[in-house]
């Protein structure tokens, strides 16, 4: 199973080289089956099968049911946990949403991941509980756009990020919460109060400002301006 990235040139090159390496093993019989998944497979799923026929199946970024059913048919097995941790056991990445609706001029993420959709808060909190029972103490909360979390889950289109972080912070055993990849436009300012009030929410916030020049921001389709960014920084 080769997991790929199709976002930047170096990552695409590394992904292709890895697929070709295992395609050679597939031809020689050293590998019984070869599957490819992830961003590259999602973005170029029409072109790649003809170029690399040794791959038995190509799966897009969200083809979870297809991956599971195909592998289960070929390799029946029992997996002891819903999630396998690949980081050091004390910390884990916690993805709370997938996709992006921003469509910045320079970014391919919406083409790869599709439109933004949030995970249900109950599902996320349950995953946190499961992971803390296995020894995880630090959670890196990630998404392509943290600022948009929850807007698709309520009719008022309001962010649910602050409430979600509070609920994660309430879970026994959670020592650190660190927030990654917020978008400056529509940033939920009530989150700043949560960061200030909760001792297990780190004084850390990853926001991609990208630029401060209004003409450049307009060309980039970033939907913010110098004044907005300055006001947001003052509020912080």
Please place each PLM-identified region on the residue numbering.
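Cofactor-cradling patches in redox/metallo enzymes
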Residues: 2-66
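Conserved Radical SAM active-site core
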Residues: 12, 92, 113-201, 211-213, ...
């Amino acid at each position: 199973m080769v997991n790929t990235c199709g976002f930047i040139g170096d990552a695409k090159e590394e992904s292709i080289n890895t697929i070709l390496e295992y395609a050679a093993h597939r031809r020689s019989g050293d590998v019984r089956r070869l599957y490819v998944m992830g961003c590259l497979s999602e973005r170029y799923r029409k072109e790649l099968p003809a170029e690399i026929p040794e791959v038995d199946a190509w799966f897009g970024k969200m083809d979870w049911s297809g991956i599971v059913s195909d592998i289960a048919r070929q390799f029946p097995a029992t997996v002891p946990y819903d999630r396998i941790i690949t980081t050091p056991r004390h910390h884990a990445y916690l993805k709370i949403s997938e996709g992006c609706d921003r469509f910045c001029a320079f970014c391919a993420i919406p083409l790869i991941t599709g439109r933004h959709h949030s995970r249900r808060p109950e599902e996320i909190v349950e995953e946190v509980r499961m992971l803390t029972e296995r020894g995880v103490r630090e959670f890196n909360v990630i998404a392509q756009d943290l600022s948009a979390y929850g807007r698709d889950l309520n009719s008022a289109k309001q962010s649910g990020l602050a409430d979600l972080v509070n609920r994660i912070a309430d879970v026994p055993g959670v020592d650190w919460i660190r927030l990654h990849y917020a978008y400056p436009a529509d940033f939920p300012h009530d989150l700043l109060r949560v960061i200030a009030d909760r001792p297990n929410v780190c004084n850390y916030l990853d926001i991609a400002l990208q630029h401060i020049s209004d003409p450049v921001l307009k060309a980039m389709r970033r939907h913010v301006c110098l004044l907005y960014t300055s006001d947001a920084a003052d509020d912080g």
